[in-house]
Amino acid sequence: ALITTMAKMSFSNNTKRFREPNDVIFNVNNELYDSINGNGDYFTAFYGVIDMEKGMLDFSNAGHNTIFLAHADGSIDCLENNGPVVGVVKDLPFQVTSHSLRNGDRLVLYTDGVIEARDEQAALYGEERLMDIIAKNMSLNVKDFTEHVFTDLQAFCGNSPRCDDIALFAIDIIGIN
């Protein structure tokens, strides 16, 4: 909990100081390195900036899962930018990736607990199943969509134990000029 609080404060401070996602994550990494290096702790992070006038997403990814960008037609782009996790090595550069956005797109971010959830036979939920659920449910609003994913995940897992946090975040893109 302490590391999470420190990370939240660091992100809050650095997003005020820097616009570029790689600069934000670079500085968060350096600030937290001294606090968590050597004790085996680290964390993943995704930081993105959406420019609604240009219809662009600029992002950096520090060891987090692939981000899905779903389109209204059901196709999905996998937004990958696999930087190192935060807190392990100081002064590592992080990369910025840019991707165009369109009205009707949906960004889907999730924790590894979603794709690593297992059913009673120990099969993984996986990225493919999540992508299929995303593609087939683009017509749902964000609230109904996320509830549908969690309902499907619960049905898949049955009575198997949950071993990790499970979170999913979706953003519908509307109002691009």
Give, region by region, the residue ranges found by the protein language model:
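Conserved subregion of the PPM/PP2C metallophosphatase catalytic domain
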Residues: 11-177
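Conserved long alpha-helical elements within nucleotide-processing catalytic cores of c-di-GMP signaling
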Residues: 1-5
